[in-house]
Amino acid sequence: MGSGWHEWPLVIFTVFGQCVAGALIVMGFVWLKENDDKARMRIVRSLFFLWLVMGIGFMASVLHLGSPLRAFNSLNRVGASALSNEIAAGSIFFAVGGFWWLVSVIGKMPPALGKIWLVVSQILGIVFVWAMIRVYQIETVPTWYTGYTTLSFFLTMVLAGPLLAALLLRVANVTFKSTLAASVSALALIVCVAVVVLQSNTLGTIQSSIQQANALLPDYGSLQVWRIALLAAGLGCWICPLIRRQEPKTLGLFAGVALVALGELIGRGLFYGLHMTAGLAIAG
């Protein structure tokens, strides 16, 4: 019962990780297309904040596990355990992407190798998100064992990632024609609304011998409304200036990132609050 916030370390880890993966894809493409070496270096420097966010996410995951030693022990079953695969995928993404950033920021990365390394890092980010999804594809948890889980995790990456990238590129004073990225995020919001509606209907059909799924979160509907409102307001801070053919302001983009992040944190809390088993036991 509740809002699922009792799993706040996992809420932060998954949302932050997906945001970083999405932002790296956008910022990486801008870096690859940029011909000005000075602008490229400003992009690289601004990427520091991505890895800072990723570091916060990993610290939250360690709090969930209890100690760093448990995180290392969980790697013992890579290939056989979805949790081990998630930690391994996240660690590799963090290490490969972080090392690319470190070598690039000190100016020691060869140009050709740097491009390949960055693309590999972007792909590893997608693999990391997919590994997260596999952790929650549990047959005995019918509220999670659906395509909505896959959609929701990737939607977070598409909703929050490009907006975070737009903010960091603005801070770096790099020209970013963000109409396409903003359109993709707006489309993701529409899909997100559809997922909420369809999943709400599905919850009414899921039950165990002692519990119905739609009774797990009595405030599910109202919290989802707040979540969608926050997402719409956050994206509006980015999209409205573009509609007026103006460059979004740094403060507006920062507010947008904060609103979208809050909305996705609420949504992920609801996800964990929907945990129920197919047997007699109910968790959450």
Identify the function of each model-found stretch.
Residues 41-42, 79-84, 114:
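Interfacial loop-to-helix junctions that mark the boundaries of transmembrane helices
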Residues 1-56, 273-274:
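N-terminal signal-anchor module of multipass membrane proteins
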